[in-house]
Design a protein with these regions (language model features):
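Short coil/turn motifs at beta-sheet boundaries
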Residues: 35, 102-104
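Functional-site microenvironments in short loops/helix caps that host divalent-cation chemistry
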Residues: 1-96
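Short, structured beta-strand segments at or near domain termini in extracellular proteins/domains
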Residues: 104-116
């Protein structure tokens, strides 16, 4: 459910208790994933390269799906931001979508590459 395990711990992530502002990367080391990824819960949700398609997961591979080649003109946004309304929406697996031109304070991005 969460990068650190299945039990919710408010002290492991930025959920806006310090004035609803993003914080320096790595400020919540207890919340790091087992892979060493920082800040996967709280702070801001993140844009993904994947296009959104409402039926994609009906026929996708179970392991490491790459996302549809084309979609509805919307991109995927993942992860719960500090503005989430409940703990369920703070999970890394939360999947939303938006227009690529959308901008707001609850969505950012993360630079990443394949480990191979």
């Amino acid at each position: 459910r969460f990068p650190w395990g299945n039990v919710w711990e408010i002290k492991f992530c930025n959920v806006g208790t310090d004035g609803n502002l993003p914080v320096t990367v790595g400020s919540f080391e207890e919340g790091n994933s087992v892979y060493g990824c920082y800040d996967m819960t709280g702070s801001v949700s993140e844009w993904c390269e994947d296009w959104y398609h409402p039926e994609y997961y009906l026929s996708t591979p179970k392991k490491n799906p790459k996302g549809p080649i084309k979609g509805t003109g919307k991109r995927i946004i993942r992860g719960g931001s500090m503005f989430a309304q409940n703990v369920y929406k703070l999970r890394c697996a939360v999947r939303m979508f938006g227009e690529p031109s959308d901008r707001n304070k609850s969505v950012g991005f993360r630079c990443a590459k394949d480990a191979e």
